[in-house]
From Swiss-Prot:
This is Chymotrypsin-like elastase family member 1. Residues 1-16 form the signal peptide. It comes from Felis catus. The gene is CELA1. Gene3D superfamilies: Trypsin-like serine proteases. Binds 1 Ca(2+) ion per subunit.
Length: 266
C-alpha cells in the first residue's frame, strides 16, 4: 500500500500501491518569491475562533472565480480568498479579501480515494476583485495539453518549508521540472497511484510541495509563456521531498471543459 499526503493543512489518506499520498503540501527547498511575480496566486483561509488561518493556495481564473483542490474545501467551514497576498503575517497593502459565496467540487471527487483524481474545485467569490499589478488572472492551458518531460515549472505557496515544519509567512517558489506520465507511473516512482489526469513535477529529493501548498498553482513555461498546468494535490507520506516521489498535481488541461461549464452555469 502506497502512502500519500494531501497538501492542505488537514491530512487525508487515499488508496495507492506502495506508500500513501499526502494532500497537505508546502514548498520545500524553495526561495522567497519576489513581490509579486505570481499575481494569480491566492491564499485560501478559513475562520476559526474569530481569526482567519491559511489552509491552501489557489489560482484566480476569473475576477470572481478561484480554482483550488477539492480536498481543501471538504470540510464545512467559512472561507475567504486573499488576492494580492505576499506575507501572511503582515499587511502588505496589496491584499484584497473576499468571501467565498459558492463552492463547486468536481462531482467525481472522493475524499476517501485521493488517488482516483478529480481533486479540483471552483470557488465563486462574493464580489469581483480588482485587477492590478498584484492581482491578475492565471492563464490556463488549452484542453488536452500534455507537458513534455523536464518542462520548466515552478510551484508556489505558503506551505511548510520542510516536512513537519512551519508554514512560510512569505510566498515561496521552487523550480520543479515536470516528470512525464510514463516515468511518474513507473514502479520506481508512483506506480498506478498516478493517473493520466495528473501532472508530476520534481522528485529530486530536495524541492517539493508540502502541507499548506495544496490547491495552489504549478506554473509551467510553454512556448515562452507561463500557464497554470497543475493544482497541487499530494506528496508521499514518507515526507514532502522524497526522491522519485514527485509532487502530484491535478492536470488542469484535463478539466478545461468542466471549468468552463461550471462558470457558465453559475
Amino acid at each position: 500500500m502506497l502512502r500519500f499526503l494531501v497538501l492542505a493543512t488537514l491530512v487525508l489518506y487515499g488508496h495507492s500501491t506502495r506508500d500513501f499520498p499526502e494532500t497537505n503540501a508546502r514548498v520545500v527547498g524553495g526561495t522567497e518569491a519576489r513581490k509579486n511575480p505570481w499575481p494569480s496566486q491566492i491564499s485560501l483561509q478559513y475562520l476559526s475562533g474569530g481569526k482567519w488561518y491559511h489552509t491552501c493556495g489557489g489560482t484566480l481564473i476569473r475576477q470572481n472565480w478561484v480554482m483550488t483542490a477539492a480536498h481543501c474545501v471538504d470540510r464545512k467551514m467559512t472561507f475567504r480568498v486573499v488576492a494580492g497576498e505576499h506575507n501572511l503575517s503582515q499587511n502588505d497593502g496589496t491584499e484584497q479579501r473576499v468571501s467565498v459565496q459558492k463552492i463547486v467540487v468536481h462531482p467525481y471527487w472522493n475524499s476517501n480515494n485521493v488517488a482516483a483524481g478529480y481533486d479540483i474545485a471552483l470557488l465563486r467569490l462574493a464580489q469581483r476583485v480588482t485587477l492590478n499589478n498584484y492581482v491578475q488572472l492565471g492563464v490556463l492551458p488549452a484542453a488536452g495539453t500534455i507537458l513534455a518531460n523536464n518542462n520548466p515549472c515552478y510551484i508556489t505557496g505558503w506551505g511548510m518549508t520542510k516536512t513537519n515544519g512551519q508554514l512560510a509567512q512569505a510566498l515561496q517558489q521552487a523550480y520543479l521540472p515536470s516528470v512525464d506520465y510514463a516515468t511518474c507511473s513507473s514502479s520506481s516512482y508512483w506506480g498506478s497511484t498516478v493517473k493520466s489526469t495528473m501532472v508530476c513535477a520534481g522528485g529530486d529529493g530536495i524541492r517539493s510541495g508540502c502541507q499548506g501548498d495544496s490547491g495552489g498553482p504549478l506554473h509551467c513555461l510553454v512556448n515562452g509563456k507561463y500557464a497554470v498546468h497543475g493544482v497541487t494535490s499530494f506528496v508521499s507520506s514518507l515526507g514532502c521531498n522524497v526522491s522519485r516521489k514527485p509532487t502530484v498535481f491535478t492536470r488542469v488541461s484535463a478539466y478545461i471543459s468542466w471549468i468552463n461549464n461550471v462558470i457558465a452555469s453559475n
